[in-house]
Amino acid sequence: MKCPKILAALLGCAVLAGVPAMPAHAAINSMSLGASYDAQQANITFRVYSSQATRIVLYLYSAGYGVQESATYTLSPAGSGVWAVTVPVSSIKAAGITGAVYYGYRAWGPNWPYASNWGKGSQAGFVSDVDANGDRFNPNKLLLDPYAQEVSQDPLNPSNQNGNVFASGASYRTTDSGIYAPKGVVLVPSTQSTGTKPTRAQKDDVIYEVHVRGFTEQDTSIPAQYRGTYYGAGLKASYLASLGVTAVEFLPVQETQNDANDVVPNSDANQNYWGYMTENYFSPDRRYAYNKAAGGPTAEFQAMVQAFHNAGIKVYMDVVYNHTAEGGTWTSSDPTTATIYSWRGLDNTTYYELTSGNQYFYDNTGIGANFNTYNTVAQNLIVDSLAYWANTMGVDGFRFDLASVLGNSCLNGAYTASAPNCPNGGYNFDAADSNVAINRILREFTVRPAAGGSGLDLFAEPWAIGGNSYQLGGFPQGWSEWNGLFRDSLRQAQNELGSMTIYVTQDANDFSGSSNLFQSSGRSPWNSINFIDVHDGMTLKDVYSCNGANNSQAWPYGPSDGGTSTNYSWDQGMSAGTGAAVDQRRAARTGMAFEMLSAGTPLMQGGDEYLRTLQCNNNAYNLDSSANWLTYSWTTDQSNFYTFAQRLIAFRKAHPALRPSSWYSGSQLTWYQPSGAVADSNYWNNTSNYAIAYAINGPSLGDSNSIYVAYNGWSSSVTFTLPAPPSGTQWYRVTDTCDWNDGASTFVAPGSETLIGGAGTTYGQCGQSLLLLISK
């Protein structure tokens, strides 16, 4: 997640380098918030929440941008902080709105009470931009309904790149945002099916992370008008099925600030590609729709989901409930100036976590303001939007960006050391607190059972910024976690030999599911989401082809600011003249094999199957360019790697011994020294040992074959002595990732394995490579 530098002023962000699952709650969206037609489509009811407003007026428009309102209606309090009004469709048509209905709100409150002489662009009634309670009402700022199901356009777009119109403060408070502001779109319920959801157990999944636009934007096999869209992505379902992928995880698709991406062609100006700047939690991003008419993005997204479901593929979404695109105050010295176009103008104290004095925002996200995730109403919005995406849009699971913020047990005003649930100030992760958002989500939704069935798959990015926010292994039962330690230790083992101490015990722990992180909380190996690379960092190829990041290069591969300096990457000696491209491919094969042969749920980044490169850029959040878009015209080496990846995934899927539902125990898994002796404490404790092997007793895990894996972390060859295979069988080679085996048949098809031998057979394994054998 990254704050685009071009949006820093608009968003007020800094550019910075055990609870059991319960049945779904009956009261999801119990306040019936949003805009909805009645059964006869004769009336539209508008309902919005604000605990502090003293007046709210509905503004209706015939278009989403550039026009004045056609009608206004004053809402009335409906109890429990809800404001409502019902408008006859006949009245809306009489006002000149005969097509889609666009709408927004203007709100008054304690810091800006209503004055009868107020008019758009007026300061009548103004008291302060922010009061002692933290209220930030400003009737000159049209407000997007947090429950809108579609959004007309982004605040910044080809017709408006001026973020000042949405700002408060002395210079901007009277600037009226009405014609520029994003507006909600009233939708007639869609009849588009999302198909039948797969019920596959998560342990059997292979996840493919990809950007919905980048997936097809330069795929020439797809008609031009569908490239980069939900429709186009749905056309790739067969591609993923052929690769062996069982779940596609899309980078954020909720409405985000990206309409200005194309304003300056062939430039990173105005760009926000990844999409971690959510403007609304219910709306599918309109930019990614081929059909951009009202209701088009919703139906098109649903049709895409149906296409994946028809192919047996789950659909996951990356969701960003830790902050919003409104950001924080524009500077740390002026509390009055902040962006207002939705949550902040309706109920700042409900939706954001305020610092002591209520003038600024507490921030563990790098974007300027924590979403107030310990607040019940803010949690309602999270739960309601998740339910909408799961039930109406057909989504099968969610990856939560900076999920540690959803474990925050602090509320506004609880900032002293004596506050019982905030010992560290304005942020405290507390998985034992039943009221934090991560536990509320577990109560509201059914998590998919271990053996499969209906329910959601939940994935946490288990860290944020500051405090006790690094929580890898700290989430409660029901949550799976992105295992950053798996990524780091694997990269270190392959790329840092001689530069840092490498622990073969960590490699063994990674191979077997990371029990040190997940077992004590009652979780299983598959709760570890194992990855080498994802969007946030280098690609698989670059991990093994780059000596650090290069983010300052020219378009289309840069420039990008930020990015970590801790990459654990290495070009395999290419720049030093001791390595070659074949060595880089060997390292990439070894890394991917390590991932796919490990217990846990593997996650790969889109394009890794053909060695996609970003030319060492490790933070390409701002590049809506050909560098970030997948390509399907490959070299011979890329095609060979695709075949390797495809067969490797198929092997994983064919062998249940690699996908255990519980931790390996007893004779199910045996670790060996290269000599063939069982690894003992002396071997494990010797940090000079960089080679290890293991055998999985397949029949004890429902597998027809036993499996032997040898990993040589040394730079030179090591001889492994093979243990005894099951009685009546011998060991056969499936793959050896060494350079000699580079080509189209690095990973052989089933039935084409090469006989190696039985107990006591020796095998010379080249440096920094992996050997895979099966018994038969």
Swiss-Prot record:
Gene name in the database record: iam
SUPFAM superfamilies membership: (Trans)glycosidases (SSF51445), E set domains (SSF81296), Glycosyl hydrolase domain (SSF51011)
Catalytic activity, EC: 3.2.1.68
Metal-binding listed as a keyword: yes
Pfam family, one: Alpha-amylase
Co-factor: note: Binds 1 Ca(2+) ion per subunit.
Subunit structure: Monomer.
Residues the record marks as active site: D401 (nucleophile), E461 (proton donor)
Protein name: Isoamylase
Annotated signal peptide: 1-26
Enzyme class of the recorded protein, top EC level: hydrolase
Family: Belongs to the glycosyl hydrolase 13 family.
Cofactor: Ca(2+)
UniProt keyword Calcium, yes or no: yes
Catalytic activity: Hydrolysis of (1->6)-alpha-D-glucosidic branch linkages in glycogen, amylopectin and their beta-limit dextrins
Record-annotated disulphide pairs: C410-C422, C546-C616, C738-C766
Keywords for the protein's UniProt record, in alphabetical order: Calcium, Disulfide bond, Glycosidase, Hydrolase, Metal-binding, Signal
GO molecular function (one): metal ion binding
Highest rank taxon of the organism: Bacteria
GO biological process: carbohydrate metabolic process
UniProt xrefs under InterPro entries: GlgX_Isoamylase_N_E_set, Glyco_hydro_13_cat_dom, Glyco_hydro_13_N, Glyco_hydro_b, Glycoside_hydrolase_SF, Ig-like_fold, Ig_E-set, Isoamylase_C
Chain residues that bind Ca(2+): D154, E255, T256, N258, D285
Annotated Gene3D superfamilies: Glycosidases, Golgi alpha-mannosidase II, Immunoglobulins
